[in-house]
């Protein structure tokens, strides 16, 4: 069994911590790994329908969804993604964070919510996970953007089939978005 022998916080910023972890392998070998400790995030795949019943037996080309564009500094480009955000409010339940992010980024509130699952973002460099929710029964509200990336965010409505095709063509490369759309497709 692998064991952590000692951890040291190298740097802290916002809600993240860069951690240096001194480990021991099952054979007693000692080694060091550095990773980003994160509170995690949420993602919301929008279903443009009154209820989840509309998904059953339906064609993915007839089911609408919503994506938002956001500039991502590590890639130096704008990416299309599902509405999402950090779990940056201490002790806030994941679904409440998802509801808040949906309103802030897409200007939507939803009546019905379903938890789809959790994914590890990049397990070699961070312990961050993304909890994915689906929602439907939509109502528009005023968008509450925070920060320069969100100030320049665009909202795009398209069918789930179109979004999945954008993933296959490499136009959507964000992992949480690809996984969320695949999980949503499994509900049909």
Where are these regions (language model features)?
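Conserved Nudix-box catalytic region and its N-terminal flanking loop in Nudix hydrolases
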Residues: 36, 43, 54-100, 149
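Conserved hydrophobic/aromatic beta-strand scaffold that supports enzyme active sites
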Residues: 18-20, 45, 67, 132-134, ...
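Acidic, metal-coordinating catalytic segment for phosphate/diphosphate chemistry
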Residues: 7-53
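Nudix hydrolase/Nudix homology domain
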Residues: 2, 7, 78, 115, ...
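Active-site segment of metal-dependent pyrophosphate-handling enzymes
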Residues: 40, 62, 71-73, 81, ...
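Short loop segments at secondary-structure junctions
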Residues: 26-27, 48-52, 71, 136-140, ...
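Hydrophobic residues on conserved beta-strands that form the core of alpha/beta folds
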Residues: 4, 18-20, 32, 68, ...
């Amino acid at each position: 069994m692998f064991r952590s022998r000692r951890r040291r916080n190298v740097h802290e910023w916002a809600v993240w911590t860069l951690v240096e972890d001194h480990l021991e392998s099952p054979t007693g070998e000692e080694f060091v790994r550095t990773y980003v400790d994160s509170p995690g995030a949420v993602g919301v795949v929008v279903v443009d329908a009154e209820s989840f019943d509309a998904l059953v037996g339906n064609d993915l080309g007839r089911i609408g969804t919503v994506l938002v564009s956001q500039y991502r500094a590590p890639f130096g480009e704008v990416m299309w993604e599902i509405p999402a955000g950090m779990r940056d409010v201490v002790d806030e339940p994941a679904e409440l964070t998802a509801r808040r992010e949906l309103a802030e980024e897409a200007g939507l509130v939803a009546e019905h919510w379903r938890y789809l699952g959790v994914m590890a973002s990049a397990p070699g460099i961070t312990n961050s996970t993304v909890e994915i929710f689906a929602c439907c029964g939509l109502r528009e509200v005023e968008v509450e953007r925070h920060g320069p990336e969100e100030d320049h965010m665009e909202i795009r409505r398209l069918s789930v089939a179109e979004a999945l095709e954008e993933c296959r063509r490499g136009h959507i490369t964000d992992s949480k978005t690809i996984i969320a759309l695949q999980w949503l497709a499994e509900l049909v």
